[in-house]
Amino acid sequence: MTNLQDQTQQIVPFIRSLLMPTTGPASIPDDTLEKHTLRSETSTYNLTVGDTGSGLIVFFPGFPGSIVGAHYTLQSNGNYKFDQMLLTAQNLPASYNYCRLVSRSLTVRSSTLPGGVYALNGTINAVTFQGSLSELTDVSYNGLMSATANINDKIGNVLVGEGVTVLSLPTSYDLGYVRLGDPIPAIGLDPKMVATCDSSDRPRVYTITAADDYQFSSQYQPGGVTITLFSANIDAITSLSVGGELVFQTSVHGLVLGATIYLIGFDGTTVITRAVAANNGLTTGTDNLMPFNLVISTNEITQPITSIKLEIVTSKSGGQAGDQMSWSAKGSLAVTIHGGNYPGALRPVTLVAYERVATGSVVTVAGVSNFELIPNPELAKNLVTEYGRFDPGAMNYTKLILSERDRLGIKTVWPTREYTDFREYFMEVADLNSPLKIAGAFGFKDIIRAIRRIAVPVVSTLFPPAAPLAHAIGEGVDYLLGDEAQAASGTARAASGKARAASGRIRQLTLAADKGYEVVANLFQVPQNPVVDGILASPGVLRGAHNLDCVLREGATLFPVVITTVEDAMTPKALNSKMFAVIEGVREDLQPPSQRGSFIRTLSGHRVYGYAPDGVLPLETGRDYTVVPIDDVWDDSIMLSKDPIPPIVGNSGNLAIAYMDVFRPKVPIHVAMTGALNACGEIEKVSFRSTKLATAHRLGLKLAGPGAFDVNTGPNWATFIKRFPHNPRDWDRLPYLNLPYLPPNAGRQYHLAMAASEFKETPELESAVRAMEAAANVDPLFQSALSVFMWLEENGIVTDMANFALSDPNAHRMRNFLANAPQAGSKSQRAKYGTAGYGVEARGPTPEEAQREKDTRISKKMETMGIYFATPEWVALNGHRGPSPGQLKYWQNTREIPDPNEDYLDYVHAEKSRLASEEQILRAATSIYGAPGQAEPPQAFIDEVAKVYEINHGRGPNQEQMKDLLLTAMEMKHRNPRRALPKPKPKPNAPTQRPPGRLGRWIRTVSDEDLE
């Protein structure tokens, strides 16, 4: 991932390398952490076209090694003939021991002409087959297209001059490293002897019943009678072994058998011949055993193997013409392909067939393969290796993207020109902060955005080390807001006065302040500013935005912010408001992209992130803080907002910051605070009191500050501390709806009036409101107008309707719309709403429809959380509610769909149990018992480790259990008779004596005999 300070790009290197291998290798961000080096290997071949002008190139796009593919030319008899293998430029086993394939792409095209040919002819068909090479039934030029029904895995009739590109996409994840078949030190009498270490991971085994009491009978012939006992399809491009036995019985004396195994290539020719038995005489009346034990190394396999054949030659010692020969046989063989079942080794295969290319032309195969490689001991002395970085967010994002590759237009075979054009689209997919312009043009934007919302926040919540990935969620909205889009909670700011605001691209401006008239005055003083000439966004844009994430058990204080959208130099178009939370520390990963990178310093030099850099915040703080917009607050958590809120300007959040700095609460304080705290310890009043009050009430919070608030704390900081309420919230949402002393509908109207605008700010406005109410009582038409206004405000479309009115000054479009609207009793009205009147549409959906919509909403929310069994039908059967904790636990433990209306109380408090595999237990026991190369752990120690896993329900040992296991291992090692004897320790006080005769190289000591 990129640096946290980079706010424009957040690249996932792994998916970028997968989709564009030419950009270079990248470490796979899974949890297979071994020191490795990244290497990009090229493959370039110029293949000569045969006499028929047709040929076939077989690619193994996922093979983890040097083998890339093979080339075959079509003969005049209709059969293919093997030409050559396609490999990487460097022979990897010569320098490296282990390998993992990261990405691979190959391009096939022709741009050369033989003598006498003046135009490029020929076309190419390409297909990716999700099976092995031997499983293809029709490999002709046209028959290849029937190998798959997936349109993203085949292309046809591409001009040979344009070419095709083969892209390797992974079929599995979290794979281990593969041994490359590298040579190992060995000495033999034969100077040509070679010893290699081949991969034994995930072998592919073919079991062949060669004979089941097969009866053979024939007459003697000179040279013997040859039969094919069996022929079976296999696939192999790496080392293999054949094992098994056949049992022969005969009643004829003097029979002699010979057996030969043939490994046959894709073109039908014999690649390897091995004699299993020669002149093997059969004894009558008994079982004659013929064992098979063959090992074929990778070096002997010069082309892809697709079948195996066993021939039996029967002869008779001293036989004469007409002599009868007969025997019966039974037995089975097993063909083991080393590493054959490793994902990508033998399947899928991509076949590229060309036809009608001029004879003698050159077809160029060029590509790149990116690897993670572990060098051999000699190379490791001079090559630096590094661990891969575990990044669950990047890995999860890659998996989700590739799981939707058919919907996102990601193919395995491409026309080269189309693949080149898609590179910009692939860069958008790899960049989590990209605006997805090209993806939007193709209709993929919504899918990718949904994947981003699912992949990154979930991972950052489950894996705290991956929290920086939440920083990348969604798209940057700065290009929409402009450089000067800022929100304010205090004093006015005329941001358009800056020179950079005069950019021709920025033609909208969003301002937010507590003193709207001052903002207008400042804007009026900049008459030549071209910025303020339109409305950036209506409140509906913010209302329709999606939530980002939840922050659990985080201390926070809350304060409301008022946002003013200005249409022109004198008209405040709309008011909006948002609740913010103050969180300790630098937590830009929790902010929307529009706020990141912006901060203001306090008087003590610390930073408050989320504020516009406008001077200095008049506070003394002891640490850094971050302010983030929120959508909701619960008992111990807050719901973050993804709304494109610009940085804050002003001082009315100072009270919340000061409280956070002094008391440092451990959970969110359920009271909103407002007020500008000055250097003298006094709390100053702020404007837009009722709008902020309504903002707090919508979340069920009280508003605390100086003045006529829910909690009037007075203008002094000490008084504020004494009168400040405790943390618990003491009322529900929309508190005005249930007041007993109001008429039934008055509470709703009062709440809407409080949330709508600043009706109660001045006596003039209050008198105007009373005048309107009096006019409505005497004028039914005016009463209807007020009802329409309340309907627009309740549904949040006041600004939209105002914009529509500006575009339709004479109301022609509105009259046409109303004239063409379905009337009560009309055919279209009856088809949509039945025989009821026109008012049915205004009343909304029926209870049954609303219930179904609720079930669908619950199901979609569960789907975003990865709970896919909660379909709308299941939710309806479950009492129109989501899964209970017991149902979720039951599904997590058993992966079975829980029964609706069954609570599964036994699972609520039951600890999640899982079983550890024998391989996992053995690996843990080996790691604890000793380092690699030491003695293997005894079975008793393995049993002790297995007991720990059983106690921990499938999890590994904790610290105390690890100490006990280490002590047990030490005791067992001391009791082990095979352990090496300890070195004798010198006595601590005994002086060391110089051995006799070692005074020097040329000085001989004088003995007593010399003195005599």
Swiss-Prot record:
Keywords: Capsid protein, Host cytoplasm, Hydrolase, Metal-binding, Protease, Serine protease, T=13 icosahedral capsid protein, Virion. InterPro entries: Birna_VP2, Birna_VP3, Birna_VP3_dom1, Birna_VP3_dom2, Birna_VP4_Prtase_dom, Viral_coat. GO terms for molecular function: metal ion binding; serine-type peptidase activity; structural molecule activity. The record marks 441-442, 487-488, 494-495, 501-502, 512-513, 755-756 as: Cleavage. One of its GO terms (biological process) is proteolysis. Residues 513-755 form the Peptidase S50 domain. Changing residue 512 to G: Smaller amounts of cleaved forms of pVP2. No effect virus growth. Residues 1003-1012 are annotated as: Interaction with VP1 protein. The active site is at 652 (nucleophile), 692. Gene3D superfamilies: 2.60.120.20, 6.10.250.1030, Birnavirus VP3 protein, domain 2, Capsid protein VP3, domain 1, icosahedral virus. Specific enzymatic cleavages yield mature proteins. The capsid assembly seems to be regulated by polyprotein processing. The protease VP4 cleaves itself off the polyprotein, thus releasing pre-VP2 and VP3 within the infected cell. During capsid assembly, the C-terminus of pre-VP2 is further processed by VP4, giving rise to VP2, the external capsid protein and three small peptides that all stay closely associated with the capsid. It is an enzyme of class 3 (hydrolase). A divalent metal cation binds at residue 30. Pfam families: Birna_VP2, Birna_VP3, Birna_VP4. Changing residue 441 to E/Q/R: Lethal for the virus. Residues 969-1012 are annotated as: Disordered. Its EC number is 3.4.21.-. One of its GO terms (cellular component) is T=13 icosahedral viral capsid. Residues 975-986 have a biased composition (Basic residues). Capsid protein VP2 self assembles to form an icosahedral capsid with a T=13 symmetry, about 70 nm in diameter, and consisting of 260 VP2 trimers. The capsid encapsulates the genomic dsRNA. VP2 is also involved in attachment and entry into the host cell by interacting with host ITGA4/ITGB1. The precursor of VP2 plays an important role in capsid assembly. First, pre-VP2 and VP2 oligomers assemble to form a procapsid. Then, the pre-VP2 intermediates may be processed into VP2 proteins by proteolytic cleavage mediated by VP4 to obtain the mature virion. The final capsid is composed of pentamers and hexamers but VP2 has a natural tendency to assemble into all-pentameric structures. Therefore pre-VP2 may be required to allow formation of the hexameric structures. This is Structural polyprotein. It comes from Avian infectious bursal disease virus (strain Cu-1).
